[in-house]
Regions:
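An amphipathic, aromatic/His-enriched active-site/gating alpha helix that lines ligand/cofactor pockets
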Residues: 24, 30-37, 55-89
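Short, well-ordered beta-strand segments in beta-rich or mixed alpha/beta enzyme
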Residues: 2-8, 39-66
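Residues within well-formed alpha-helices
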Residues: 3-5, 17, 25-28
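Glycine-rich beta-strand-turn "strand-cap" elements at beta-sheet edges
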Residues: 40-46, 76-114
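Short, surface-exposed ligand-recognition loops at beta-strand->loop->(often short) alpha-helix junctions
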Residues: 9-19
């Protein structure tokens, strides 16, 4: 899996337009092959900061998305940013859920009794 994250700061004047464009693109991305999730987040502590987070099943699907017409919308928003956007692509080799918390808590209980 590949986690693609873009954090960008927009001017107050361009924030609404950027949010509208990214929401539309995220919606289109969700139906593309290999897209596991596509979400837009607003930073609660910093005004005018947006984050696009997408999870792709593999690098090939992500690369196809990066070449798509829909992704041109993201490039447009990146050009609107008032600071250099932070862009990351993280490869995830494995993923777990609640079982990791349960195991850690169970293992901790054993250590406390020893």
């Amino acid at each position: 899996m590949v986690l693609a994250t873009i954090r960008m700061m927009m001017s107050a004047k361009k924030f609404g337009e950027a949010l509208r464009i990214l929401r539309s693109m995220a919606e289109q991305s969700r139906v593309q092959p290999g897209c596991l999730s596509s979400e837009i987040y607003r930073n609660g502590q910093e005004d005018n900061v947006l984050m696009l987070e997408q999870l792709w099943s593999n690098e090939e699907d992500l690369e196809r998305h990066l070449r798509s017409d829909e992704y041109r919308q993201v490039l447009l928003v990146l050009e609107m940013a008032i600071k250099q956007p932070e862009i990351r692509f993280d490869t995830i080799l494995s993923s777990t859920g609640i079982e990791t918390i349960e195991k850690a808590r169970k293992d901790n209980g054993r250590r406390e009794r020893a």
